[in-house]
């Protein structure tokens, strides 16, 4: 049993939805893509809950700071770990199934880890005060740090998370498809 199968199997609720069948002999093709797809739906639930919190911050007249924190967390969770990871998992599942090559080894593990670790690090940066809109990028991260809107540490932590996600998508994923 692979590490990916074990993680999927031991995950409450989602583990049963994305269970990897070992009896078919396709575990090597399905395990890592199933873990990536399952992880993307976990992030979707997180993003959905944050999406419900956004109007609540306005209804209860909380600080606009809370609204922008929630907005940034919601956008980052939908963009990076949900959308990118879902595309990656489905793509690897199809490429493994069509070509018949196993998706095993250190590269799929690195891909899954960098995607989720990068998203978690970006989440920490937002909680540290980085509140950049994913779409508009206003104010620019360095300008916001120079103006005192957020700290330079949150910018560094945020870009570290974004770097890990982009490394996963630009470098690791194409290597997995070509492998």
What residue spans do the PLM features occupy?
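Hydrophobic alpha-helical transmembrane segments of multi-pass integral membrane proteins
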Residues: 1-179
């Amino acid at each position: 049993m692979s590490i990916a199968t074990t993680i999927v199997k031991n995950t409450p609720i989602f583990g049963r939805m994305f269970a990897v069948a070992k009896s078919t002999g396709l575990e090597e093709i399905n395990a890592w893509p199933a873990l990536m797809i399952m992880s993307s739906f976990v992030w979707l639930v997180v993003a959905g809950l944050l999406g419900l919190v956004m109007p609540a911050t306005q209804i209860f007249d909380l600080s606009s700071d809370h609204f922008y924190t929630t907005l940034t967390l919601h956008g980052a969770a939908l963009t990076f770990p949900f959308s990118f990871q879902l595309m990656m998992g489905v793509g690897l599942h199809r490429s493994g199934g069509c070509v018949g090559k196993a998706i095993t080894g250190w590269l799929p593990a690195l891909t899954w880890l960098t995607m989720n670790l990068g998203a978690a690090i970006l989440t920490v940066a937002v909680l540290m005060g980085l509140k950049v809109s994913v779409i508009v990028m206003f104010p620019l991260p360095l300008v916001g740090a120079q103006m005192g809107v957020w700290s330079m540490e949150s910018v560094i932590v945020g870009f570290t998370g974004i770097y890990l996600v982009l490394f996963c998508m630009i470098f690791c994923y194409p290597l997995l498809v070509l492998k």
